[in-house]
Regions:
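Long, low-complexity segments enriched in small/aliphatic residues
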Residues: 1-25
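Long, contiguous, secondary-structure-rich segments that constitute the structural scaffold
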Residues: 22-38, 42-164
């Protein structure tokens, strides 16, 4: 990091989703409804962050929100955030919010210099700052199990009982 962006961000997957898909499966969103921002307790204390509260993660390319997850399972002055998108925003007046509100990839580079071996952009070791988001969750984001009711399956007809 540096003085303006003193924390190192790494990103990666969580086991609930395959790459960027399946965010519209209500059962999976109940398990992992929003992206967590994992950080060491000393990092959280240093920046005035409480476990479970909403935080901003910001660098010169933009800022995104996630929920703080304070854990000893990550190095000090490092945070981890999983890429995320919110399909519930696709049917709104601003569908771009689906991929801009909580998607850590907003903070990555979109122009060279890319990884010379793979030709990909950098997903690890991004300098950021992290701080409380007093405004809380993004407006309209589905974060509670009852929010996912519109996506629950509806049965069109009864299923015949074939085993008794």
């Amino acid at each position: 990091g540096n003085d303006e962006y003193p924390v190192m961000l790494t990103e990666g997957r969580v086991p609930f989703y395959h790459h960027g898909t399946l965010r519209n499966i209500p059962y999976l969103r109940e398990l992992y409804p929003v992206p967590l921002v994992s950080m060491h307790p000393e990092t959280a204390e240093k920046y005035g962050i409480v476990d479970g509260e909403w935080v901003w993660v910001e660098n010169s390319r933009g800022k995104v929100r996630g929920k703080a997850f304070v854990t000893l399972g990550i190095a000090k002055d490092t945070i981890h955030m999983e890429r995320f998108w919110n399909p519930e925003y696709l049917d709104t007046d601003d569908p771009s919010r689906a991929w801009t509100e909580m998607n850590v990839n907003i903070l990555t580079k979109t122009d060279g210099k890319f990884n010379p071996e793979h030709g990909t952009y950098v997903l690890r070791g991004l300098a950021v700052k992290v701080y409380p988001a007093p405004e809380g969750a993004p407006e309209g984001a589905w974060i509670n199990p009852t929010d996912f009711e519109p996506w629950m399956p509806e049965y069109s007809e009864s299923t015949e009982v074939v085993f008794k």
